[in-house]
Structures are given as C-alpha cells and as structure tokens.
Amino acid sequence: MSNTTVTTLDDNVFERLLRERIIVLGQEVDDGVANRIIAQLLLLSAEDPATDITLYINSPGGSVSAGLAIYDTMQAVAPDVATIATGLAASMGQFLLTGGAPGKRGALAHAEIMMHQPHGGVGGVQSDIRIRADMLSRLKRQILEITAAHTGQPFERVEADAERDRWFTPAQAVGYGLVDRVLTRSP
C-alpha cells in the first residue's frame, strides 16, 4: 500500500504564505490550531530571528489555554509578531490581535473586533466546581491584566468593558489601544 499525501491548493497557498513569513489564523482556536501556529512561529524565528512575522487573524476565539500558548510563543520568539484583524477578531482572537508587537497591530477597514471576559462551563462535584471557578477567575484576571498592559487602559476599565461583549470598529479599536492603525489603501 502506498503512503501518498494529497496536497491541495489550500496547502500550497499556506506554504507560500509561510515562506513570506505570514501566518493565518482563520478559525476557532483549539489545541491543534495552537500547535500549528506555535510550530510556524518557532520555525520562522529559527530561520530568521531579525525579520518580522505577520499573523492575520479572522477568528471567533476559542480555547483560553490554547490561545495563551500562542500568545506566550508570540512574546517569546525573537522576531516581532505583527498582527492584523481581517473579518472577525473576537474573544481569544482579539486577545491575540492586541498581543502583537507594539506599533505593529492593525485592522482592515471592515474588521469587527470583540472583547469579553473568558468563560467556560463548569460541572462535577462541588469541590471540583470550586477549583474550576477559582481557575477561571485567575485566568480572567490574567487576561485582563495582559490586555490592560497592551492597550494602556486602566485594569478597572478593561475589567468593566469586558464584563459583556464589547464590539469595536477598527477606528474605535485604535482609540482603545487594541490596535495601532486601520489598514486601508487609497484608490
């Protein structure tokens, strides 16, 4: 039996983008997606630690632990990681967008950006529920502190604004400090 791998047009496109130091997050963040993006960040950093990497984000969010793994890698690699919102950057997608290199975070003109507090389901016996609730509280504080640091907003404002879904236009996201600029091309 033959072990042939089928290469699709999508595979070729993403390989070509990777050669240009472009990574695309175009889906929900889960462990598999995080592992792929982390591997790409590490590869590009090893190949050329001095040249920026660009991460395009069109994601509704996803797993907090997977997103934090991507974020930590973005902060750890030598090259700056520029981030660009395309379409939707919500929840963990917004967090990763805001975690890009200072001065190198952008949003396309019609991108939608949404910030809110992390959430997750809790079930089981009472002691497990308490442990999980404590962990979620810790993660919430951690994410809000990181967001406050990247935006320059006071922690209390970020905490209040993230209590419910908070939607931003690209221009509003610039004003809040989630991104640095709106990317447009003059006709």
Where does each model-flagged region fall?
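Terminal-region recognition feature
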Residues: M1-P187
